[in-house]
Amino acid sequence: MFRSLFRPTVVVAALALGIPALASGTVMRHLKLVRSFPAADTALATSPEKITIELSEAVELTGSKLTLAKEGGAPIALAALRREPTATKVLRADVTTALSSGGYVVSWRTMSKDGHVVKGTFGFRVGAAK
């Protein structure tokens, strides 16, 4: 008697736990940073004209933010954040003043179409690498 009740219970439990786990591989994906310009941890010879981030899926401009700061310093003003016209996965902000030599940190925050907020940071250098 015990053995005959045990098997269906195990099968039901395995299905209940296994199906959502399999589905989460496709349903629960979150957007992530694919690439940036400047690329993380690179040194540029001259000041960049723009900062861009490319994400793994389309993003909402509302609620998105991109900030630039000199390492250990105050934020540096950027032009208004926008999506690239032909690429809904790319956010761009133009650099309005030439950056001096040194290290910089880019912080970003955005939201996917399904409402998940994702954020990150990366650094780059202008001028000779240390």
Q: Predicted segment positions?
A:
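Surface-exposed, short loops/turns at beta-strand junctions within beta-sandwich domains
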Residues: 96-101
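Short, surface-exposed alpha-helix to beta-strand junction/turn motifs within ectodomains of secreted
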Residues: 51-79
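Beta-strand-rich extracellular modules
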Residues: 109-113
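Extended, polar beta-sheet/loop recognition surfaces of beta-rich domains
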Residues: 50, 54-57, 115-130
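Short, solvent-exposed loop/linker segments at the N-terminal edge
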Residues: 42-46
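Bacterial N-terminal signal peptides that target proteins for export
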Residues: 1-12
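A short tyrosine-centered beta-strand micro-motif
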Residues: 104-106
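Proline/serine/threonine-rich low-complexity linkers at boundaries of modular beta-sandwich domains
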Residues: 22-34
